Amino acid sequence: MSHSSAPERASGAVITEWRPEDPVFWQQRGQRIASRNLWISVPCLLLAFCVWMLFSAVAVNLPKVGFNFTTEQLFMLTALPSVSGALLRVPYSFMVPLFGGRRWTAFSTGILIVPCVWLGFAVQDTTTPFSTFIIISLLCGFAGANFASSMANISFFFPKQKQGGALGLN
């Protein structure tokens, strides 16, 4: 997405011209598009936050359903999504310019189904090894990385004077 002043070309859903700092453009077209992207991003991040924090709710209940993990192992399962999320934030912040905001938001939100479904199967079998839970926990960290790409995406759409409010809602 460029901040160019070149004439707009019809190219389907791809934005070829974006001038959020131009008040006329912002009123006529920009605000509507920016708001739509913000309101799509907010529920995607809500879902991401739920997946990211999933193990904080699951870990305390694993011993109650028959898993024999130590307290240290349970704390590790709770901490690993934060670790992988922090490490993945750097590459995720570069994905929006590479793939586009809508594509990346859809993809990065969609892949969160993998750790959720896998965890759903894993907790049903008390013989599931701890190493499997480690992998699932690390995959939940992908949800934490979504925040970096979402901030990069939404900041492109809003003029400087409105970015604080938009990013605060996001």
Question: Can you annotate each of these PLM segments?
Answer:
Residues 52, 56, 88-93, 148:
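Conserved kink/hinge residues within transmembrane alpha-helices of Major Facilitator Superfamily
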Residues 115, 129-145:
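Hydrophobic core of transmembrane alpha-helices in multi-pass small-molecule transporters
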Residues 36-69:
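Extracytoplasmic
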Residues 98-109:
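Cytoplasmic membrane-interface "Motif A"-like loop-to-helix N-cap segments
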Residues 145-159, 167:
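Intracellular juxtamembrane helix-capping segments at the cytosolic ends
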Residues 110-126:
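C-terminal ends and interior cores of transmembrane alpha-helices
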Residues 73, 162-169:
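Cytoplasmic loop-to-transmembrane helix junctions
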Residues 76-94:
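Central cavity-lining transmembrane alpha-helices of secondary-active solute carriers
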